[in-house]
Every structure is written in structure tokens, then in C-alpha cells.
């Protein structure tokens, strides 16, 4: 990840939104939730994360600088809602009805589960794998786990194990790599199985 220095005006805007939304929630819910810590150490393509045990919100500095207003308006309330939901309802699904209610009714922000930011600047090297129905791009970390025989991944759509294949027509001696690992698991995206 590229390192990014967050300008003071942007840090202040983040804190202003955080404090305003927290005050809004405290008034609506008749509570006195403490102010979470904000740090700028989120990595990869994730815009932000809420750490419940630390009462902390981590923001991706590169994506923040590239998408300033969207972070202020959407990402900060999104992550704050996760913290508030946990304190108010206990352990519930991360983007379930309680989270949607907190976003829309309490914080007055659309309950979008994912961001739509361009991620070219934070995208890491990927490796192409295939199943019976589509192509998948796996991260270097997942690719290396497969090579070491520690994991394999299953397509959630067709249920088949992902296999690295060479589509290099210049080298007909390259065959699909198939690792001798058992099949298993289900999910929506390619998932790790041990």
C-alpha cells in the first residue's frame, strides 16, 4: 500500500462527522456512547473497519484521500454504526436489520454495505484462477497458500475448486495446475478452506 499523509483539514472533517453522528445517536437512543478512536491504518481495498473490542475505527488513508467527501459522508457513519449496533444490540449480523436501522433511522445515512471507490491505487497483484463457470482473481496471499498446500478455494456459484490455468497459447506445455486437496465448503465469494 502506498503510504499517505492525511491533511489536518481532512482529519478535522472526519472527527467533526464522527462527533456529529455520535451525538445524533446518543440523543436518539438516550445513551452516552464514548467517542471511538480513529486511526488511518486500514490496508488493501477495504475502506474502513470497526474494531469493537478497541472501540476503534480504522480508515484506509489512500482511499480516504482519493474519495474525501464519500468517506466523510458514508464510511465514517458506516463504521460508527457497527460500533453502536454492538453496544446497543449485542452480537448481531454485521449488516443485518439492526445495522440498517442504525444507519437509516438513527444516523440518517443510506445503508450501503460496500463502497464503489476506484481501487486501482490500492489493488495488489492478483492471480487468475478458474472454476467451471467463471474467472476469479486471487490475491498474492491466497495464491501462495494454495502453492504451499495450506488452502484451496471454492467458487460459491458452481461449487467447484478454483484452479490456476495458463492461457498462454505460446506455451502449449503449460497445463492446468491442480493441487491434491479435498473439496469442501460453501459461500458467496471464493473462500478459503482448510
Swiss-Prot record:
SMART domains cross-referenced by the UniProt entry: SprT
Gene Ontology CC: cytoplasm
Q: Where in the cell is it found?
A: Cytoplasm
Note describing how the cofactor binds:
Binds 1 zinc ion.
Pfam families per record: SprT-like (PF10263), Zn_ribbon_SprT (PF17283)
Cystine links in this protein are none
Q: Which InterPro entries does UniProt cross-reference here? A: SprT-like_domain (IPR006640), SprT_Zn_ribbon (IPR035240), Uncharacterised_SprT (IPR023483)
The Swiss-Prot or TrEMBL record lists the needed cofactor(s) as: Zn(2+)
Gene3D superfamilies annotated for this entry? Metalloproteases ('zincins'), catalytic domain (3.30.2010.10)
Which UniProt keywords are given for this protein, alphabetically ordered?
Cytoplasm, Metal-binding, Zinc
Q: Where is the active site?
A: 79
User: Looking at the keywords, is Zinc present?
Assistant: yes
Q: Name one GO molecular function term.
A: zinc ion binding
Has UniProt tagged this entry with the keyword DNA-binding?
no
Q: Which residues form the SprT-like domain?
A: 20-163
Q: Where does Zn(2+) bind?
A: 78, 82
GO terms, biological process: response to stress
Q: What is its main location?
A: cytoplasm
Q: Which HAMAP family match?
A: SprT
Q: Give the UniProt family note.
A: Belongs to the SprT family.
Query: What NCBIfam families is this protein classified in?
Result: PRK04860.1
Q: Output this protein's name.
A: Protein SprT
Q: What is the lineage of its organism?
A: Bacteria, Pseudomonadati, Pseudomonadota, Gammaproteobacteria, Enterobacterales
Gene name tied to this protein: sprT
Amino acid at each position: 500500500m502506498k503510504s499517505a499523509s492525511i491533511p489536518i483539514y481532512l482529519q478535522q472533517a472526519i472527527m467533526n462527522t464522527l462527533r456529529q453522528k455520535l451525538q445524533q445517536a446518543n440523543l436518539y437512543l438516550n445513551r452516552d456512547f464514548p467517542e471511538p478512536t480513529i486511526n488511518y491504518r486500514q490496508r488493501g481495498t477495504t475502506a474502513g473497519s470497526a474494531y469493537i473490542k478497541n472501540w476503534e475505527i480504522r480508515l484506509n488513508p489512500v482511499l480516504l484521500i482519493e474519495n474525501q467527501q464519500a468517506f466523510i459522508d458514508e464510511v465514517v457513519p458506516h463504521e460508527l454504526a457497527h460500533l453502536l449496533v454492538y453496544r446497543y444490540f449485542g452480537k448481531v449480523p454485521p449488516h443485518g436489520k439492526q445495522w440498517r436501522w442504525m444507519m437509516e433511522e438513527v444516523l440518517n445515512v443510506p445503508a450501503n454495505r460496500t463502497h464503489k471507490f476506484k481501487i486501482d491505487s490500492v489493488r495488489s497483484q492478483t492471480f487468475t484462477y478458474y472454476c467451471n463457470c467463471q474467472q476469479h482473481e486471487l490475491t498474492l496471499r491466497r495464491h501462495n497458500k494454495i502453492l504451499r498446500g495450506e488452502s484451496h478455494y471454492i467458487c460459491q456459484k458452481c461449487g467447484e475448486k478454483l484452479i490456476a490455468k495458463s492461457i498462454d497459447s505460446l506455451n502449449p506445455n503449460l497445463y492446468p495446475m491442480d493441487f491434491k486437496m479435498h473439496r469442501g465448503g460453501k459461500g458467496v465469494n471464493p473462500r478459503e478452506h482448510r
